[in-house]
UniProtKB/Swiss-Prot annotation:
Compartment(s) of residence: Cell inner membrane
GO biological process: protein transport
Sequence ranges assigned to domain ABC transmembrane type-1 in this UniProt record: 81-272
Name of this protein: Oligopeptide transport system permease protein OppC
Source species: Mycobacterium tuberculosis (strain ATCC 25618 / H37Rv)
Function, in words: Part of the ABC transporter complex OppABCD involved in the uptake of oligopeptides. Responsible for the translocation of the substrate across the membrane. Glutathione (GSH) uptake by mycobacteria through the OppABCD system contributes to the depletion of the GSH pool in infected macrophages, which impairs the ability of the macrophage to detoxify methylglyoxal (MG) and contributes to enhanced production of inflammatory cytokines.
Amino acid sequence: MTEFASRRTLVVRRFLRNRAAVASLAALLLLFVSAYALPPLLPYSYDDLDFNALLQPPGTKHWLGTNALGQDLLAQTLRGMQKSMLIGVCVAVISTGIAATVGAISGYFGGWRDRTLMWVVDLLLVVPSFILIAIVTPRTKNSANIMFLVLLLAGFGWMISSRMVRGMTMSLREREFIRAARYMGVSSRRIIVGHVVPNVASILIIDAALNVAAAILAETGLSFLGFGIQPPDVSLGTLIADGTASATAFPWVFLFPASILVLILVCANLTGDGLRDALDPASRSLRRGVR
């Protein structure tokens, strides 16, 4: 327990020394909290219409301006952040869990389990997932359809990570502590949960952080193209799509949601890089050597 605590402390110290990663994580948390805490404080809801303020630029009444329907862009952007960030987090958690389960089982047991699971991985990797999701996904307007979208995105987002977990598990299964646990009669399930998964936790944490950005980008792309979340509900993708046509004449309709999307993606990637450097310092040295 002491060794685990000391390693955890060392990882936290490494991460805190990375100012860009710390600032990015703080920005992500601030955006997530703001998306849920600010809407009740605003005078307008995301679906309220102000016919006296159509396509108004940012001002004291509407801080980020309004769109062609007179809807407040600040309220709409916050609503879009709620949907996009929630979908991103859910997809990252589910896909990372699938990757950990499949990779650990495949790498630990080997044999027919390994061949079967890797065949499934190879099959899913060649499937044009984005096109398939766009075809299968209905226009999501309620929570059940949004959950279906989350499951689809997660179902096509775990394969590469599972291969990495499998490789690490194959190297771990012949280590002395794993062999000792087997000789003591510890069940395979307890070995995987208690010994294998904690030793591959670093790659899972990094994968989860980076998957948030990938899932948000995928959901935004689907909504932008007319799939996924659609009006009357909003996501960052639908807001960007609505503002594209008038981006030159009324730039605020496009720029604010697009800027928020870029900020979320950059912060998520910087946070993932910071976690990778903290958990695996050798990777940072290797990247510097390549440069």
